[in-house]
Amino acid sequence: RMMELNKTIYWKPESTGTGRFGKWLENINDWNLSRSRFWGTPLPIWATEDRTELKCIGSIEELISEIEKAVAAGVMKENPYKNFKVGDMSKENYSTDNIDLHRPYVDNIILLSSKGEPMRREPDLIDVWFDSGAMPYAQVHYPFESKEGFDQIYPADFIAEGVDQTRGWFYTLHAIAVMLFDSVAFKNIISNGLVLDKNGNKMSKRLGNAVDPFDVLKKYGADATRWYMISNSQPWDNLKFDVDGVDECRRKFFGTLYNTYSFFALYANIDGFTGAEAEVPVEKRPEIDRWILSELNSLVKDVTASLEDYDPTPAARRIDQFVGENLSNWYVRLNRKRFWGGELTEDKLAAYQTLYTCLETVAMLAAPIAPFITDRIFRDLNATSGRHTEESVHLAEYPKCNEALIDAELEAMMSLAQRASSMVLALRRKVNIKVRQPLQKIIIPVLDKEMAAHIEKVRTLVMNEVNVKDIELITDTTGIITKRIKPNFKTLGPKYGKYMKQIAALVAGYTQEQIAAIEANDETILDIDGEKIVTTAADFEITSEDMPGWLVASEGKLTVALDITITDELRREGIARELVNRIQNIRKESGFEVTDKISVEIEATELTSPAVESFAKYIAQQTLAVDVKAVAAPAGQFVVDSDIDEVPLKIAVTKA
């Protein structure tokens, strides 16, 4: 019966339930319940000297009744528990002054057999694992109390402990529950792995590789520690604990989340946005708002599914990815100008409301893993908006997915923009061309009309993100982009290992058209010695070769080619953007308010003079400057030594 009921328990991982625990149940031996100890729960069994009669006492009431019989028969002088009131469940009644059921006191109790012979308690104790297994009942004094409502706490919805407990707590819980109630003691369970050192060795003070958790908590905080442990590996896997990983979580995830909130709070306070304003309908908001809200609700859906599956690791990773890639690095960065200056227009209000919703929802989603910073963000947001009556994120309802706001096509389109942008930025880094330096063009080969339509919709967005003047879409890459193909041994090997040499030889001779067909089609059938081999694009590694004056990158079905030729005009614009960066830094370091107008003087050099002449208006717009000039000797309120491309220059900034 224990094996049958075990199959109804949801084990994470499943292999522990079917393997380690299941095999243990299949080969189980009788449980030797007694232990020769002093401290613990005494066996409630009394026996005559010849062991012909045994009594197992089931309650204090029964014990006191048996003691009274023994006293009446003269076997005991008096009842040691005479002051105890049966039925009185108060702490005072259960004080050790009234009753103590431990050794040595219980050893002095002598009961009376049915034949009038004295009965003494078996001297052993109960195995402490029986105490642990009885925890569900003992914690509420069942069945002597809490009969009503017991079914609300039993069986437990969820428990977690180390995998070594398959023969300990997991077993005793299960055995007692099956014996007493023909039931399971728990419905869902995670068997935790071990925490090892960063090299995968068991931590030991003797070896000096132990990490003091209190030191980690003090230095990095509980949130970062918890997030690292949950996101780094699934709970049932062994965790190679590296303090540097905790610090990375603190900087990357929590630093990004806090900076995003700080950005929102800064401009919301300037504009007087509270979060209590009438909502701009989602359908009236810009596409970028609808996209992030779609991604947000997909996030809620994914995180909820992971947590309901008792798998918090993918949940943490999805939240991390959303905050870092979608919210901070994409939405906020592409929408900064919507928050700057001007009146609180409907467009700006939509931006505030969208970012507010994202921050609030992320705080609520992440709260079970990072309880402190999420509660701080939730409370700060709610203090001005009053959207929630609950004073803490931990009292609020968990977010629910709004399926109506999920737009899969919009997400796919924006994902394409993100991937293309990421690839172009990686190409820039490859040759040390800063993003502030504009380039002329990127070429993207399109495989079908849908891909072309998606890129057209995000054309301007990608151009702004990677700072290029144009995107050219092509269908024929002949003479422009040369691709190479080879088998992906990780995916093809397990399926067609004995044919790998033939497959490699076959695709090595593929034309550009054949390679393009593999990228475009869902499946490609190869004929190897009469054997039909079904493959997908993922079964091959397809790379692109650089062209003269261009850099090329491929990722899956997406290929981009970047023109890295810098003309004089592009160079001047790049210098202008560098000047904007330097002036913004001076504004910040000099303590200017974000709304302050300024005047700017830039030292005239061969680099700066042409740039200022061509782009003075652009520089002024970006820096809230009323005047921008290139002069021989800059003078003003703040004169700062700076440089561009390691060429020194002075910049003067004065509050206008």
Each PLM stretch: what is its role?
Residues 228-231:
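Structured mid-domain segments that build the active-site/substrate or prosthetic-cofactor binding neighborhood
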Residues 174-179:
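Substrate-binding cleft of carbohydrate-active enzyme catalytic domains
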